[in-house]
Regions:
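Non-catalytic DNA-recognition/assembly elements of restriction-modification systems
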Residues: 1-18, 32-67, 190-236
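Short coil/turn segments at secondary-structure boundaries
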Residues: 27-28, 69-77, 164-167
């Protein structure tokens, strides 16, 4: 289900902001219905009339976290501690780690945008609340109404490939703010941004709810299976 929702979100972004067939004032697809397009020298392509193109770092900023010593790690939730988000946590919940909550830590909620700095550099992450490690960077939208548009922009194939390849071409192979500084982002009118934000927020909520339900089933399986195997529990016909 979540793969389908993610694919729908990607298709909607492509339809509205790459093909420019967002609904016009009559509800018809803008470009296909003859909407006015103008050449943009920065992007080297036509964009809808009235849109502007600005440096990416005018709509968002980059934030990093420090790396606490491993001696501070604990592996069960405890008061005064916060979850320590690592890249691997987006693939599995089997190595959950907690660290002391301090004022120096940057904390993210489940909707905030994170990005891999190493390995799969440029991959966009979200869905876990806590403090992120040094292998991740936070993308802070200056206007929260632009968060889903920014997330989709960064997740698009062209931008991901550009960031990943530009990072891999460097000697350290680490994504940082300088990679984002190269980007330019098209800015549609406010009404279109708000409409997109409303649709995508509903999708994100559904995705996170599905993740929670899936995790509950996994936890139940992990609790019940050992008891079934050693005979502590049985299933009645």
């Amino acid at each position: 289900i979540n793969d389908n929702l993610e694919q729908q979100a990607k298709l909607l972004y492509d339809y509205w902001f790459t093909q420019f067939d967002f609904p016009d004032e009559s509800g018809k697809p803008y470009r296909s219905s003859g909407g006015k397009m103008v050449w943009n020298e920065q992007l080297k392509r036509d964009i809808p009339s009235g849109w502007k193109v600005i440096p990416f770092l005018e709509v968002a900023s980059w934030e990093s976290n420090s790396q606490p010593p491993k001696s501070e790690f604990i592996y069960e939730p405890q008061e005064g501690y916060v979850r320590f988000i690592q890249n691997r946590d987006y693939e599995s919940n089997t190595h959950i780690t907690y660290i002391p909550l301090t004022k120096n830590l940057s904390i993210v909620d489940r909707f905030d945008i994170l990005m891999d700095k190493y390995g799969d550099a440029g991959a966009v992450r979200y869905g876990i609340e806590g403090a992120f490690n040094v292998a991740l960077g936070k993308i802070c939208a200056h206007n929260q109404n632009y968060r889903e548009y920014i997330r989709s922009f960064l997740s698009s194939d062209g931008i991901y490939n550009f960031l990943h390849n530009s990072c891999m071409a460097s000697t350290r192979a680490s994504l940082n703010e300088s990679n984002l500084a190269i980007l330019n982002i098209p800015i549609p009118d406010e009404k279109l941004i708000l409409g997109y934000e409303k649709i995508l927020c509903k999708m994100r909520l559904s995705i996170l709810k599905n993740n929670d339900e899936t995790q509950k089933l996994i936890d139940l399986r992990d609790w019940l299976l050992p008891m079934l195997m050693n005979g502590q529990a049985t299933i009645n016909d």
